[in-house]
Amino acid sequence: AQCLVGSEMCIRDRLYNIIDRVYIGHIPEVGALALTGVGVCMPLIMILSAFAALVGNGGAPRASILLGKGDSRSAEKIIGNCFTLQILISIVLTVIMLLGGKTFLLAFGASENTIEYAVSYFNIYAIGTIFVQLTLGMNMFITAQGFTKIGMYSVLIGAVINIMLDPIFIFACGLGVRGAALATILSQGCSCIWVLHFLFGKKTTLRIKKENLRLVPKVFLPCLALGASLFIMQASESVISVCFNSSLLKYGGDVAVGAMTILTSVMQFAMLPLQGLGQGAQPIMSYNYGAKNPDR
């Protein structure tokens, strides 16, 4: 059951990104170019997600293992260190993306026709980096404790709000791609509030506590080592996407890049059930590994 909830959570998470692009593609007169511009932003957004996975997917399994051993105190040190680390990484990434965003986008496949839309979308999205990092990274610690439905709600809240705000900001307010980016970061902000409210609250097994916020290398370095493999996988996917965009822009133009954006969304959506099964099974396997119960 937990694996099925994990699959549903992944599907809902990707679904609102796809709907986001559907709205952008229907912007009058400039929809195709706007969609292509936003598509060029995807490699950078994937890199941001990779950093969230580096910390979240590295720390959450270790916390589950310690819970299985009955060492909740050490598990809370991990969640506190990972929370601090996510904030610091978010600040650094935000500065880098805001200062070098246009340069990155031009290198990643934006053309003279699409750079305006790419920059308009990404500059706003970059401001909300901290929401993305904390939502994606810290939500893993909710599912790691067995609260998979709570983790699903954090995704569902963001998805519903984003779907509601997209047409308002894009069409009613006439903000175009800027409206799509604004809707995204506001929805991620709401999800972030939900995640942190739970992790700072009393209903959770592991809480974020003030005394565990100070970074301790022997606590967070093993988490980064464990999350490095997923980070490399997602970063590699970003590099592949950049190569595709550059080649398509050279030989097929902006329309080809836009078509690849749509195709990539469909391919990612098709892979989500399997990713969700793995995400749902991870807390169970980690906990039982820590409890020395391999048969279960």
What kind of region is each of these model predictions?
Residues S7, A63-I130, A172-G227, M285-R296:
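Short alpha-helical transmembrane segments in multi-pass integral membrane proteins
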Residues G56, Y125-T143, S154-A159, A180-V195, ...:
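Short runs within selected transmembrane alpha-helices of multi-pass transporters and secretion channels
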Residues S7-E8, F122, A126, K149-L156, ...:
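Hydrophobic faces of transmembrane alpha-helices in multi-pass small-molecule transporters and flippases
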Residues I11, L15, I19, F51, ...:
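Generic alpha-helical transmembrane segments of integral inner-membrane proteins
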Residues L15-L35, L105-E112, I168-G174, A235-S265, ...:
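Helix-terminus/linker motif at the lipid-water interface of multi-pass membrane proteins
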Residues L35-V95, V132-G151, A259-R296:
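Small-residue-rich hydrophobic transmembrane alpha-helices
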Residues C41-L44, T84-L88, I127, Y153-V160, ...:
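Hydrophobic residues within alpha-helical transmembrane segments
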